[in-house]
């Protein structure tokens, strides 16, 4: 009788596990792990020209989700085919391939991969910049002692893990680079993954289309899948996608189960996956951080400028990167030719600073207005009481994170682009200052405390008599 009960209990447990596995698909969660390894190693090997073994050790292996599986993770870098494969104990394999001009993309099956034409590739990165030069061709060391001390602290490592792994710091004041420093293996022209800082770039691409009157922020998002007569998602606006207040079930948790990670690493058509999400709240009433929301904007940008990878690359370089003199940029695409505008742009630290300078100058570069008048103010207004604006983080409002930054000495008018592992841009209009810190930081919150200290000490160095 006791044995029978145990067998019944075991059967119930196994049945429950089967149901849970069918719903939550742990295989998909684990595949996001091999997808991250394959994709990020591909990008940092073939775009950034970094050592893949060092990238795995510094960037991937220490991440919280990898601590339990890194021992079983295997990867192969094929320099001849320009691809990276990764697997977990020989299964759940992922493969990423490099494409000229478009960076790396995960291959999920036999899908056709979007490419850029030779004419587009030849035209990229060659147009004359409108932004005045921020520096010459050599590294600019700090000359003010307190500024040098600030950079020393930004690169200093704690006695034990987790590590800061600062890779680059660039500081631009009143349009001129006043200090920069790079870790070994990195330099002025090294393209560095910005992760979610790319969302601020997508904000700019949307802003350019608004300036050209090809998009309207308070109009419904032009996604055909939502245009059914009885589809409540048809009420979601461009602004609500920018502000992550769409009400869609696309909340981001950072786990292998959340929709953003499954979108990035298990879907060839990322926006197609995201646009299938259901509504869980009325649009504009609920905020939740969501890379998938930004990816929907990337699809809208692609479709508005021609619907192909070739068209969106020409648009991004002609209208944004070339005027700013951003020569190192790789804006990666998914298989459909949609920019991965939520997560995957690589650029040198100087180019990230040039991008920040566009916003510092209210969307004007070389006398030409690129972004609509008032766009920067719109982008940095807090959303529903949070510290998030519309593609930028802000110090405005009463969010605890914003209030903390002000308390430690960061001006109230500052706003930020934040990316995973400590990628940071700070734009501070009252100081005419742009600060970029690129890292592979595994300290709490991507070493936010270290970045805040860098900002405060940089400002102090500009005002020695205060």
Predicted regions and their residues:
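Structured C-terminal helix/loop/strand segments within mature extracytoplasmic catalytic/sensor domains
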Residues: 29, 414-466
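Beta-lactamase-like hydrolase cores
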Residues: 134-174
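Active-site Gly/Thr loop motif
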Residues: 326-330, 380-434
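Conserved catalytic neighborhood of penicillin-recognizing serine enzymes
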Residues: 227-257, 263-285, 292-295, 347-350
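Short, charged, amphipathic alpha-helices and their helix-cap/turn boundaries
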Residues: 146-153, 176-181, 220-222, 257-283, ...
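Active-site SXXK
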Residues: 175, 193-221, 241, 297-301, ...
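Active-site-proximal alpha-helical segments within enzyme catalytic domains
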Residues: 200-203, 292-302, 343-364, 423-439
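Active-site helix/loop module of the DD-peptidase/beta-lactamase fold
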Residues: 211-249, 276-279, 306-343
